[in-house]
Amino acid sequence: MAGILSVVHIIIIFIVRFKSSTDSLITVVVSASFQRANIYKFSLLAKLAHGAALIPRADADTWTYLGCYTDQVGARTLGQVGYTLGGPGNMTVANCQNGCASQGYSLAGVEYSSECWCDNQLRNGGGPAPDGEAMCSMPCNGNPEQKCGGPGRLNLYQNTAIKPTDTMTTSAPSTETGSPTTTSVPEPTQGLPDGWQYSGCYQDNVNGGRVMFKMLPDSSTLTIESCVAMCVKLGYTVAGAEYSKQCFCDNYLRNAAPQAIESECSMTCSGNTQQKCGGPSRLSVYSKGNLTVLPIPVPQTGGLPGGWKYQGCLQDNVNMKRTFPYQIVDKTNNTATNCLSRCSKFGFGAGGMTYSEECFCGDFEDIAAAGAKLVPEAMCSQTCSGNATAICGAGNLITYYRWMDEPLQKWNRPTGINAGRYDFLIGGVLVPLITTVGINGKITFQEKSGTGDPNTTGAYEFDPYYEKDFSKAWREMHVKTDIFCAGGLVLPDKVGRQLTVGGWSGISTEGVRLYWPDGSPGKPGVNDWHESPDDLRLQNGRWYPTAMTMSNGSILVVGGEEGSNGAPVPTLEILPRVGPVLFMDWLKRTDPNNLYPYLTPLPGGNILAAYYNEARILDERTFDTVKTLPNIPGAVNNDAGGRTYPLEGTMVLLPQKAPYTEPLGVLICGGSTPYGGDALDNCVSIQPEVPNAEWVIERMPSKRVLTCMAGLPDGTFLILNGARKGVAGFGLAEDPNLGAVLYDPSKPVNQRMSIMANTTIARMYHSEAILMADGRVLVSGSDPQDPRFPQERRVEVFLPPYILSGARRPTFTIANKDWAYGGKYKIKITSGNQSRIKISLMGMVSSTHGNSFGSRTIFPAFSCSFGTCTITAPPDSHTCPPGWFMLFVLDGPTPSVASFVRIGGDPGRLGDWPATGGFPLPGV
């Protein structure tokens, strides 16, 4: 077409760096190639210099939407690439329309979230999609509220101000380039790394996507050497140069990339005109060693873990709502196997992958709740970051799988009396922080000062004998220092004194307080809490410490902080004092998420410490680490989830049964994720002394933080209180969890939980749950300092099904309540069916912040004859540390009222301690 200007290519790039609200730096790069020289002059530059618009903007009223149209690589419906403001990452409908208008085209089409195509006519048989708008569903990169086509689909617009060409053609449009074209093969390169070679010219943008994974920024100085060097630096073994200035990296070619004729890789490199750097949708490919071309990716349907089955391509983000709630991002190794294994490990039976690198887990019921539907499979088109031959969804689309085998968990849903019941017990006189059952059958309540009621004494004793008579039920007691965030225990001395250590601030953090229980049910005592800070205190001040009775009868005090949100106290010490404190690096490293660490003596002779999301076994003499356990699992989408304060869950010991050959197990339920995220929805258990032991995960029916747990005399555990979101602290949790769960370790794993009755009272931060001597669970407290949830003085009881059944309780008498290890002791059964008798020993518990200090469940050996049962005490102090226990006799599931027995004596001679400060001493 002689005499007519033929502009091969014009590219305008805008880079704006704002220097102030009124001043900016604008860089304009204009690149042009001509078939005839000296014909075209750039009046545009003059316009730019005078502040004209950088890109001509189309009038929005002149564009008409035509619909969703078909497209295919190699036979494009629109033949020209549209160059847009901000490039593919900022693609919007308007940007594409403006780009096409600025190039003089009347048709504009957006595709695959990031592509803009222009022309004045439809080509290669392209037309309205046979499935309508279904596959034009991908959001625009620059505006997710708009649709930018899909795989092989264009959202097509026409500028009515420009008359399009009516002629259709099946031939490809002429290739327009930004550099002169030739048909020669690439110039041999020098200086490539050893083993690298030219592998040929290959097609890009085929079969629904790019054929190489990593796209580097465009370069105006690109050479083959520089492209290969950048890929080598990033760890890749394949490099591809495209369109003169683009460099791609990968370890193979994807999407069954077909080889093109060499003449199609004809654009010279922007940094070396003697080299060829691909062409439009053509790659000059270099590889280290042989080149691998992967097949077209498909959803993985074989080799799936467990009972997973492929279901199809599922919508996500319908009406801005995620289909599945838990997201895991894996930029390098997302596969169906990895994703689904994670989901089912944590008890989720629906899930899948999206956007190449994202894994989602949830339940089948989530799909309907989100309004998500299955769509044509081809719409899920992105390859997995960990498997380039498999599909992992697309934008807002999930490659969806469902667990089709036996259910991952079976939650029992009892009704009526079998679900238990909450009952109001009595109005309180304080908001308790610590509750402890005494061997006198009464329960001590202690509250913090400062934020507590101004007219209380900080401590009271509750006598259940008078639970119907408020005036007699509460006995006033007194403490001198603030027990806020202290730890508590029942000591193994012969009178079962109660101990609290640590506190809120100053001298309180060093506090050591003792109470000698006296009186009996219906008979008031006279003793009070005793402390003498000048004579007896901890070596280190501690806020949130743990106290534990060791196998030798001494008291181990571990961890804490210097005061409220203070520096860590990464030490441990022993009471009575036998030496200086010992530094523990693991306490310092995991602060502040390790407060109130979980501790227990182990039958093998050492000590288990579990804290934050870690656990280890300590030598009971040196406290050196002898074994590090696997990290404690957190949330399905967050390994940083933790179990100890402030990510507060609860640990208990699973029941021990004579002859005590089964390794001891521990159970931890609830917790949270850092920074006030979702609470954890699982329990985990482990037998720490078993070689190569792993944590077993059991999903709970609901999320729970600020968890409380109470062991019951039948060997089950009641899980209650807390919230579904947040962490421990004032005002840091929300969405109260009002339901109770019963955990029965005698049942198979993942079938142990029953959904029990609900309460109407939110039990949030600073709530407690503790087993009473009559088998009920006393539920108290809630002190979140949050206007959404009141300070809670009301005291409830949870009545397990064995209380509500109406069955008559067994009764017994006992003479000897001070047992030696391995000794045999007789009780007289005065009522009950001897053939159904079971006997349990429940450790005396002090409950605070979800902790159940002293919790232990033992089913000892026994034999019965003619109404007399002989019980064999546990064999040693590692199986059963010295201490006080509630002895229950059960007739089937129905427990007696407990008697209090001591096992193992007082080997640490705590009865003679402290010999200072005027403390009353019971002796040994």
From Swiss-Prot:
Glycosylated residues (UniProt): N90, N290, N333, N387, N455, N552, N758, N833
PANTHER family: COPPER RADICAL OXIDASE (PTHR32208:SF105), SECRETED PROTEIN-RELATED (PTHR32208)
GO CC terms of this entry: extracellular region
Organism: Arthroderma benhamiae (strain ATCC MYA-4681 / CBS 112371) (Trichophyton mentagrophytes)
SUPFAM superfamilies: E set domains (SSF81296), Galactose oxidase, central domain (SSF50965)
Chain spans, region Disordered: 166-190
WSC domain location: 62-160, 195-289, 307-404
Cleavable signal peptide: 1-24
Subcellular localization: Secreted
Protein name as catalogued: WSC domain-containing protein ARB_07867
Source organism, top-level taxon: Eukaryota
